[in-house]
UniProtKB/Swiss-Prot annotation:
First-level EC class: transferase
Catalytic activity annotation: (4R,5S)-dethiobiotin + (sulfur carrier)-SH + 2 reduced [2Fe-2S]-[ferredoxin] + 2 S-adenosyl-L-methionine = (sulfur carrier)-H + biotin + 2 5'-deoxyadenosine + 2 L-methionine + 2 oxidized [2Fe-2S]-[ferredoxin]
PROSITE patterns documented for this protein: RADICAL_SAM
Gene symbol of the encoding locus: bioB
Domain Radical SAM core positions: 39-267
Protein EC: 2.8.1.6
Record: residues binding [4Fe-4S] cluster: C54, C58, C61
Protein name per its UniProtKB record: Biotin synthase
Record pathway: Cofactor biosynthesis; biotin biosynthesis; biotin from 7,8-diaminononanoate: step 2/2
Organism of this sequence: Nostoc punctiforme (strain ATCC 29133 / PCC 73102)
Pfam family, one: BATS
Length: 335
């Protein structure tokens, strides 16, 4: 069985990424089968509980108040609304709810208290709950843990070297500090990046090296594909080739074998065949929706019926929620 390492070198990762494609997919699929059931995919639902009006300048984001996009600032959703959305998602087979707020950081106010209540209620439904709320202090992480939060998402986005080209209002160290604050609790870490920002292969390798040398690895590694939003600085970026996406997923799977690798934002433009290659390369999670949207109008997302049809075609089942004590995947060899 392939062991888990935390000392990956840049040259090693680049060599893996540049392996002939079919051989790379084979190697990644072999690793995947040692740690995960290759016949199961976790289906997740992302709820934008606070949309738009973010003060940060992330070049890709429609929710930044600095850019003229179709997204307008909205108030925090009512708890009952969020819980009802989660309940409907659960009825379709969704096992993980991710709640996102367009905040720079979490503030200790009534809105945070409301989020804590949302976490409690959705956790009580037997679902995994993930939050992505911006920067987080150690004390706030503990409060989320006490509310029953399963995971906290804080992406690195890209390599440390390329990062300042994409965002200037939050440092790379800020992101790593938030991850460390989450690590002080029993909440699992969700952290990945975005393809298509204008980064080089070296930047992709650098981001993966940072993630793969965190000890422990993030339990969840989302691989996002840029959706070019009109009005943002990256609106004219070219599409990422499918084989770049597959290479990134396969490399992440080999470097972090026990982690969930999530085929996240940008999946709507991929065909069923292209998504099948991503699953073969080690992706074992997707985001689905009942309204063709992931974050309001910012990122299109396939609907439940479309995804169910695809999973049935590929012979893949929906994975149930994990239990707290199982937050790090155990090795499981499936025939």
């Amino acid at each position: 069985m392939v062991g888990i390492r935390y000392d990956w070198q840049e040259l090693e990762i680049r060599a893996i990424y540049n392996t002939p494609l079919l051989e790379l997919i084979y190697q990644a699929a072999s690793v995947h089968r040692q740690y995960h059931d290759p016949t199961k995919i976790q289906v997740c639902k992302l709820i934008s509980i606070k949309t738009g009006g973010c003060p940060e300048d992330c070049s890709y984001c429609a929710q930044s108040s600095r850019y003229k996009t179709e997204v307008k600032a909205e108030a925090l959703l009512e708890k009952e609304t969020v819980v009802n959305i989660a309940q409907k998602a659960k009825e379709t087979g969704v096992s993980r709810i991710c709640m996102g707020a367009a905040w720079r950081e979490v503030r200790d106010n009534s809105q945070f208290e409301e989020v804590l209540e949302m976490v409690k209620d959705i956790t009580a439904m037997g679902l995994e709950v993930c939050c992505t709320l911006g920067m987080l202090t150690a004390n706030q992480a503990r409060k989320l843990e006490e509310a029953g939060l399963y995971a906290y998402n804080h992406n690195l986005d890209t390599s440390q070297e390329y990062y300042s080209t994409i965002i200037t209002t939050r440092t790379y160290s800020d992101r790593l500090n938030t991850i460390e604050n989450v690590r002080q609790t029993n909440v699992t870490v969700c952290s990945g990046g975005i393809l298509g920002l204008g980064e080089t292969v070296d930047d992709r390798v650098g981001m993966l090296q940072t993630l793969a040398n965190l000890h422990p690895h993030p339990e969840s590694v989302p691989i996002n594909i840029l959706s070019q939003v009109p009005g943002t600085p990256l609106e004219n970026q070219p599409d990422v080739p499918i084989w770049d996406i597959v290479r990134m997923i396969a490399t992440a799977r080999i470097l972090m074998p026990a982690s969930d690798v999530r085929l996240s934002a940008g999946r709507a433009r991929l065909s069923q065949v292209e998504q099948a290659f991503c699953f073969m390369a080690g992706a074992n999670s997707i985001f689905s929706s009942d309204d063709n949207k992931m974050l309001t109008v910012t990122t299109p997302c396939p609907d439940y019926d479309t995804d169910r049809e695809m999973l049935n075609l590929l012979g893949l089942g929906m994975r149930p929620p994990s239990q707290r004590q199982e937050k790090v995947a155990s090795p499981a060899v499936v025939g």
